[in-house]
Every structure is written in C-alpha cells, then in structure tokens.
Amino acid sequence: MAKDYNPSRRNREAFEALTETPGNVPPQAVELEEAVLGALMLEKDSIIAVQEYVTPDAFYTEEHRTIYRAIEELSMELKPIDLYTVTERLKAKKELKKVGGASYLAQLTQKVG
C-alpha cells in the first residue's frame, strides 16, 4: 500500500536532519536548507515546532541565515509567516536583493515536497 503523504512529518524530519549535524554542514545540504525555509513560509505555525532546535547558525549560507532571521523576527512579533510577509520584511531591511530577491524566496516554497 502507498505510504500516506504527510507534509508535517516530512518537514519535521528535514528539520531534525538539519539540526543533528554539529556546526556548519557541507554545501550539499543547501537543498535541505531550501526545503526547510520553504516549509516555514508555507506551513502555518511550523516555526513554533522548530524554533527551539534551529538557529540561524544551523544554515550554511549567509543568505539562508538572513532569511531565517527574518522568519524568526516575524514569529517574535506574532505576525504571519508566508512568502509575502518574509519578502516585505527583507525588503524593509534592505536585505531582499542580498538573499536573491523575491523570485528566490518563491523558489524556496517550491522545494517543499
């Protein structure tokens, strides 16, 4: 029988895999980072499940650390976290271009699955 698709479980597994590796992980984990960031922008309240375990330092690239910090800030302000709000936060901080622009953020949401 086919395994049921459970996005929350899959994303939790991705978050756990990201945090199990001590220090910075090699560049081949960039795809995992992309999926994690994409999931955070797609799944309501997913930041609550990972904030205790994932810090900006868990991300290998500075761009991903910057995106994660923006997501954390929105969470601390009790604001919704989605593609639009993350884009606007990065734009307000003049960091949107630094992370690859709105199109890169949109691509991150397509990495989940």
Where are the model-predicted features located?
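Noncatalytic partner-interaction/assembly domains of nucleic-acid and motor enzyme complexes
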Residues: 1-113
